[in-house]
From Swiss-Prot:
Gene it is expressed from: Slc15a3
Domain of life of the native organism: Eukaryota
Glycosylated residues, chain numbering: N223, N353, N436
Keyword Iron-sulfur: no
Function description: Proton-coupled amino-acid transporter that transports free histidine and certain di- and tripeptides, and is involved in innate immune response. Also able to transport carnosine. Involved in the detection of microbial pathogens by toll-like receptors (TLRs) and NOD-like receptors (NLRs), probably by mediating transport of bacterial peptidoglycans across the endolysosomal membrane: catalyzes the transport of certain bacterial peptidoglycans, such as muramyl dipeptide (MDP), the NOD2 ligand.
GO molecular function: dipeptide transmembrane transporter activity; peptidoglycan transmembrane transporter activity; symporter activity
The species this protein was found in: Mus musculus
Protein name: Solute carrier family 15 member 3
InterPro entries: MFS_trans_sf, POT_fam, PTR2_symporter_CS
Length: 578
């Protein structure tokens, strides 16, 4: 039986409590219901997101568009980068103008519209409406000379597709930056332990959506039809939007409190220019009497300064995580390249009783290398419930539960071990290549010369990067939310995700830098492969970068913990977080 309705309960700062009556067990029950709705929305949104990214290169490279592989890869990287770098936009809109509930609702609506536009590009009529007729493929002139340069032309339907992908990235980034803090708002009144558990299960739902997308949506797109696959994506986003609106009565919604980003920038400028510091401080004190400061809307100058001091302490912690993100995103780039040059077994064993045609087809049907991401996802799906129900309660009873910063340091260690394992495996692989011990294997229409090492040797590095997520990314989310000033929680969550995107771009930039002549990734004699590269040194370089920043992180984290234990700092932080 559903709970009877009650009048809307206003609270401080215009906060709206759930439209449900509260019995003796009401608060905890409805808070869990609200959190469960947020987790379900997150799972559906992530399933839709991975459904787009997993086969986007294949879709753009299909006969519908005939994009080159380089053009399709560039579009995918742009989409992934934008989906992280645009995260502060959604957080800022939520803090200043719309509030988190309305920002999420509008973002899901934009998500639905953009995915619908992507769906229309599959049909011939839809492509003609948005892009016109596809031009005939021109015959390239003979170009025997190395100095001959072909003419560059924009790929078919590029403007429409880039616009659709940009809208999808904006919607996904806004949902990512605001849904996290909105879900934490639902359980904040239940204590810090409830917030910690929420972030554990929030990350669990992300990976559950990923595994469902990789197993179902990506398979349908590749083996049945993109029309069916993208229709499922639209349905997932529509269902997420419906569930979010349906759960409105049980949500705690908070009005926009205003973002202090501009105030923070002004204070940063004043602190960098001592000549302006005293004059601005004198002008503020001269124009504001004590009784006027209490009636002034928004944060007072003193609160602005306290927020700025908290922000100055938080940002170094988040910035030192950037090298970890450089390592983390290798599992979607260089780890995949490495796997393509290891021996990949067939899905079906060749049966001597079947026809020659079927035998040929089955022998080329290999396990998708991207499915090794399932090892990363599986370890998260298994370990998060174990950690939440067994390990953390035991450590809490023994008063040995580590802080968020200590967990993040442990996560950086596991990321370091993952990239070291990848480097050792690559070094071993290159020894087989140097001895000319290669195995030709056909993956799709591309021929690769792989080392006779099974691809299953990559599983340890995927498992280790999965464990690192549990200890680095989840506590990082918890740290960003719980330590941020209340009026900047959305923006800080956006900055957290933005910095992860910066790590991805820095990793790509390092690959590009090492691809110049003389670099470790420069392979002019082996176009499309990495057998003449020295990617093991690239892995070890990343490990060295993360090791150095891990030491810096430990120093910054220790200093942060000592400052946080200071009584004056505790009083200031409690006032800031409200």
């Amino acid at each position: 039986m559903s709970a009877p309705r009650a009048e809307e309960q206003p609270s401080r700062s215009g906060e709206r409590q759930p439209l449900v009556a509260r019995g003796p067990r009401g608060p905890r029950r409805w808070r869990r219901t609200a959190a469960a709705a947020v987790l379900l929305v997150q799972m559906l949104e992530r399933a839709a997101f991975f459904g787009v990214t997993s086969n986007l290169v294949l879709y753009l490279n299909s006969l519908n568009f005939n994009w080159d592989g380089q053009q399709a890869s560039r579009a995918t990287l742009l989409f992934l980068g934008a989906s992280y770098l645009l995260a502060p936009v959604g957080g800022w809109l939520a803090d200043v103008y719309l509030g988190r509930f309305l920002t999420i609702s509008l973002s899901l609506l934009l998500y639905l519209a953009a995915s619908g536009l992507l769906l229309t590009t599959i049909t011939n009529d839809g492509r003609r409406s948005f892009c016109g007729e596809m031009p005939e493929l021109p015959l390239e002139p003979a170009c025997p000379s190395s100095s001959c340069q072909g003419s560059w032309s924009s790929p078919y339907c590029a403007t429409t597709l880039y616009l659709v992908l940009l809208l999808l990235a904006l919607a996904a980034s806004s949902v990512r930056s605001t849904l996290t803090s909105f879900g934490a708002d639902q359980v904040m009144d239940l204590g810090r332990d409830a917030t910690r558990r929420f972030f554990n299960w929030f990350y669990w739902s992300i990976n559950l959506g990923a595994i469902l997308s990789l197993l179902v949506v990506a398979f349908i797109e590749q083996n049945i039809s993109f029309l069916w696959g993208y229709s499922i994506i639209v349905g997932l986003v529509g269902l997420a939007f419906f569930i979010f609106l349906f759960a409105t009565p049980v949500f705690i919604t908070k009005p926009p409190t205003g973002s202090q980003v501009s105030s923070m920038l002004k204070l940063a400028f004043q602190n960098c220019c001592p000549c302006r510091r005293s004059s601005s401080r004198d002008s503020e004190s001269a124009h504001l009497l004590p009784d006027q400061r209490s009636n002034q809307p928004g944060p007072s100058p003193q609160e602005d300064m306290a927020n700025f001091q908290v922000l100055v302490k938080i940002l170094p912690v988040m910035v030192t995580l950037v090298p970890y993100w450089m390592v983390y995103f290798q599992m979607q780039s260089t780890y995949v390249l490495q796997g393509l040059h290891l021996h990949i077994p067939n899905i079906f064993r060749t049966n001597p009783n079947i026809s020659l045609l079927l035998r040929s087809d089955s022998s080329n049907y290999r396990i998708p290398e991207a499915w090794l991401l399932l090892a990363n996802v599986a370890v998260i799906l298994i370990l998060i419930p174990v950690k939440d129900h067994l390990i953390d309660p035991l450590l809490l009873r023994c008063k040995l539960l580590p802080s968020s910063l200590q967990k993040m340091a442990l996560g950086m260690f596991f990321g370091f071990t993952s990239i070291i394992v990848a480097g050792v495996l690559e070094k071993e692989r290159l020894q087989y290549i140097a001895a000319n011990q290669t195995v030709p294997q056909l993956i799709g229409k591309d021929l690769y010369y792989a080392a006779p090492l099974s691809i299953w040797w990559q599983i340890p590095q995927y498992l280790l990067i999965g464990v690192s997520e549990i200890f680095a990314s989840i506590p990082g989310l918890e740290f960003a939310y719980s330590e941020a000033p209340r009026s900047m929680q959305g923006a800080i969550m956006g900055i957290f995700f933005c910095l992860s995107g910066v790590g991805s771009l820095l990793g790509s930039g390092l690959v590009a830098l090492l691809s110049f002549p003389g670099g470790w990734m420069y392979c002019p004699k082996d176009f499309g492969n990495i057998n003449n590269c020295q990617m093991d040194r690239y892995f070890f370089l990343l490990a060295g970068i993360e090791a150095v920043t891990a030491v810096l992180f430990l120093w910054i984290a220790g200093r942060y913990e000592r400052t946080r234990q200071d009584p004056a700092s505790q009083r200031s932080s409690s006032r800031v977080r409200g």
